[in-house]
A protein has these predicted regions:
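Acidic/polar loop patches that form or flank catalytic/metal-binding clefts of enzymes
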Residues: 13-18, 105-110, 148-151, 166-177, ...
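N-terminal pre-triad scaffold of radical SAM enzymes
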Residues: 112-141, 174, 267
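Flexible, acidic/Gly-rich N-terminal and inter-domain linker regions that tether
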Residues: 1-123
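Conserved SAM/AdoMet-binding glycine-rich loop
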Residues: 164-277
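Short Cys/His-rich local motifs and their 1-3 flanking residues in nucleic-acid-associated proteins
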Residues: 142-145, 180
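Hydrophobic alpha-helical scaffolding
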Residues: 81-88, 123-130, 144, 148-155, ...
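Cysteine-centered iron-sulfur cluster-binding motifs in ferredoxin-type domains/subunits
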Residues: 125-138, 148-157, 161, 165, ...
Length: 277
């Protein structure tokens, strides 16, 4: 948003702001995006499942901010929809800044006439600890939404938000979740991802954990302990999915023990799409 504002402030017309990462735009010619990968046309997608799959695969292969190319989908006879490469991962400070904006922590009052939003009871007292997921589960679109590179909030930011939760009049002492796309991913899969992006054509955990995978739950354990120790907090649950193959790859069983002892609210939630048995 800041980049768009800067471009407008510099005097560029909207029609020429076609280069900002994480944005999609409409153009009449590919002259200004000569290196774009051309996807099947919109009409082809609506008529042929194989073309749809081919388009999806090209998009899937271009979700990494370090290696992705611009994508162009022909639409009609004179238009192209251009998708720019994803934005680079946010730093921890940027994550903190975004998540600590003065949100209202509830739905818009206009929904009252419809009876409210039932899901608010689950998410109102939940903490989002990070973005991104390198799990690669089948049928999961989170790679498209947030990318494979983990971006993490600081302990201090999460504790500040938890303290604000405890001041809500309907807070009963229970933090429902401290999670993300995958709860127990609190850092990138490896240090390479921060400078060179993710590996093309390879998964971090499938069919077996990569030899370069960093497996460590200590940061998450320490965060959960700090949250459990807060005044007015009775229980801290984890209701985001747990990748249990990542848990089993950890040489220490400390996280598994504390997970079972303190953080399961009746039934452990896992990310099952990476197994077939």
């Amino acid at each position: 948003i800041v980049e768009i504002a800067d471009a407008l402030n510099s005097g560029l017309p909207v029609s020429e702001i076609t280069f900002i990462r994480g944005t999609v735009c409409k153009v009449r010619s590919l002259d200004r995006v000569p290196d774009a990968l051309v996807l099947p046309t919109y009409d082809e997608l609506t008529k042929d499942k194989k073309q749809y799959a081919a388009s999806f695969y090209k998009q899937y292969c271009n979700t990494d901010p370090f290696t992705a190319k611009q994508l162009a989908e022909p639409y009609g006879s004179h238009l192209y929809v251009i998708q720019n490469p994803p934005a680079y991962p946010l730093t921890t400070q940027e994550m903190d800044d975004v998540y600590e904006l003065p949100y209202m922590r509830t739905y818009h009052p206009s929904y009252e006439a419809l009876g409210g939003v039932p899901a608010i009871s689950e998410i109102k007292f939940s903490l989002c600890s990070n973005r991104g997921c390198f799990g690669g589960c089948s049928f999961c679109a989170l790679t498209f939404h947030q990318g494979r590179i983990i971006q993490t909030r600081s302990h201090e930011s999460l504790i500040r938000e938890a303290k604000l939760m405890t001041q809500e009049k309907d807070f009963k002492g229970y933090i429902h979740d401290v999670g993300a796309p995958t709860a127990n991913f609190r850092h990138p899969a490896c240090q390479k991802q921060l400078t060179k992006g993710v590996c093309t054509g390879k998964q971090c955990l499938f069919p077996s954990p990569c030899k370069n995978l960093t497996v460590d739950h200590q940061d998450y354990i320490q965060l959960l302990r700090k949250l459990r120790a807060l005044p007015k907090v009775k229980k801290v649950f984890i209701r985001s999915g747990i990748r249990f193959d990542y848990v089993l790859a950890d040489k220490s069983d400390a996280f598994l023990k504390e997970l079972c002892q303190y953080h399961v609210s009746g039934q452990l939630k896992v990310a099952p799409e990476h197994v077939s048995d």
